[in-house]
Amino acid sequence: AVPGVRVYVPFSHGNRRSEGIILAVSDGSEYGKLKAITAVLDSEPLLSPEQIKLALFMRERFFCTVYDAVKAMLPAGLWFDDEGRTKVQDKTVEMTRLCVSPEEASRYAAAKRRRAPQQAELLEQLCSFECLPSRDLLKHTGASRQSLTALCKAGFVELYKKETFRRPETHLGDIEPLPVLNDEQQQAFTGINALAMSGKSGAALLFGVTGSGKTSVYIHLITEQLARGRSVILLVPEIALTPQMIQTFSSHFGDTVAVLHSSLSVGERYDEFKRVRSGKARLVIGTRSAVFAPADKLGLIIIDEEQEETYKSENSPRYNARDVAIYRCAQAGCLLLLGSATPDIVSMYKARQGNYSLFTLRGRYNDMQLPQVEIVDMKRELRRGNGTDISEKLREELEDNISRGEQSILFINRRGANKLISCGECGYTYKCPRCSVSLTYHSANRRLMCHYCGYSQWLDDSCPECGGELKHVGAGTQMIETELKELFPDTEVIRLDTDTVTAAGSHEALFERFRNEKIPIMVGTQMVTKGLNFENVTLVGVISADQSLYAGSFRAGERTFSLLTQVVGRSGRGSKPGRAIIQTFTPENETILQASRQDYEDFYESEIQLRRLQNTPPFSEMLTVTASGLNEAHVFQACRYVRDRLDNIIGRDGSAVVLGPAPLAVVKVNNRYRYRVIIYGKKLSGLRGIVSGLVIECCTDKRFSDVSVYADNDPAE
């Protein structure tokens, strides 16, 4: 047994068979008598020494077990079931090939043509192709299986198994030439490529306005790395973006592209993993977990739309893909490139402090203009008697676009028909019995649903408390779709949210329909806000710019600015100028005004001053300890215990500030109450071990046996 292989071991007093991975081998042990390994499951290591080091780094950085870290790295199909079989097997195809020379096969075929014409036909086909899949060979010749078996027995052909890969659907065509770079792009490429070729680890930030052509710079950088025999990982924030990226990069790099994301089948993920590990695929494109791809000779990692919170995992291991990428680049001696039109505040701060190299694309490619943005005050719309969610200005612009044959995208960050249903008489509101949130109404099936736990129920005809009339409050994607169809009954509207893209590949199919059929209007959630490139889209409408602005997070302003800037940037990406309408109840809000001007520099200056006053990142680091359980009092007590212990430890040096316990914004989810303790400090690396120890204490303390406790480094919320 060697490090990196999986084994079965007898676990606990009952010697329950458990699967594990060997991390290291030693001649001695501090534990005295040890149990023997039951079985070694791999003939060669699944994990390289570099991956084992990464797992150990993740244990310390992200408060997880090594096993959790390893499971995040490996595709699900590699793990064994209770009978000792892997959950997904290698896919093979039966092949047929000649065992004799083509000349001898031809002579035998000529001799057999009258008495065994099928055998003759099989041999003649194989003389032309040498080897073929048995199924195709029989299909093309019309021969029977018995004829093929007879040739095997005669020693003229042999059957063997050949491994084949289950591949995600990609549209491979002719390889396209490299895109032509403008002066600004060329300057950025030259500088970044020099860093990538230096053989030293480092990080760079490519800050470019929407439509500036960051992808073209990526393509040139990847070309250079592949030419050197190096591998590249490209991360995208959303599965919805992956098909477009695959199409773009496959047109330049062909079959060397591998795809890794959660919408693939288990078999596809397993086979793509093997293609990367074997070196058959050297450009990996995927979402957050693709950062673990076993790419050999890593030359570059690119994180596109690096500010997106989807790069942070909310389940164990609670890693940030950017942190993992920084570690991998440091170990491999290569460059990490962060790209965005609205960089994370911390990333831009590091770039301005000189920790990252900064490259800027200030203009759109081919001198296209940024969209013209107009803010609409929805309070004024209400005073004018317009009680719908679509302002008069947006309606007029949509009408103009439809008449010109141009397309429009409308964004609202809430799926369903209505945010909530309430009684106009007594004020009763439908709430989830398992979570501390209101139920969202879905008109398609006339059900009220909880978007946290999945609970649903039918909508009553009248208030269940007093029998009064029910009011529909707050619009979602379904309601906007309905309003659009009422305004434009002869116009097709396509909706894009998690309710319409449940099946694998369904988002890709919707995007293709929108692009190819020139459907006039698309309405959707965050899936439509970033990375998409539709040349005929000349109008973007933001239904409610206020939704994310007043969330209880110090990042609320940053997320709102990024969201608005990104969605506005979907307009005018072709030869026609773009427009955008932002609807809001707070038109004087500074963040909304900055987003309407697409002025990141101004937003950064005001936001960094606020962060400095608040002492929030990048001016401090942040850890949280979260407890959850069915008994709210026990959950609070567990957090109180952590807070008291930290106060005793930190109180001696004042190196950090401890806040809480406090309930999360949604305190109850699926009948479990959630409280947390927040720790701020200039440098918290010394506290991580202490916090980890406190989490273990809580998990083993009988007083908190019904409470789950975990720590998180730099949480998203």
Q: How does the language model describe each region?
A:
Residues E130, V667-K668:
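Accessory RNA-recognition modules of RNA-modification enzymes
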Residues A633-N648:
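Extracytoplasmic/periplasmic
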Residues I175-N182, Q186, T190, K200-F636, ...:
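Inter-lobe coupling/hinge segments of SF2-like helicase ATPases
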Residues A1-S340, R352-M368, I678-Y680, S685-S692, ...:
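Accessory, non-ATPase domains that flank or precede helicase/AAA+ motor cores in DNA-metabolism machines
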Residues L484, V567-S571, L646-I650, L694-K702:
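Hydrophobic, Leu/Ile/Phe/Ala-enriched alpha-helical segments that form helix-helix packing faces
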Residues N670-R672:
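C-terminal effector/interaction modules appended to NTPase cores
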Residues I649-L664, S705-N713:
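Short beta-strand elements
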Residues F253, F488, I649-G654, D701-R703:
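Short helix-capping segments at alpha-helix termini
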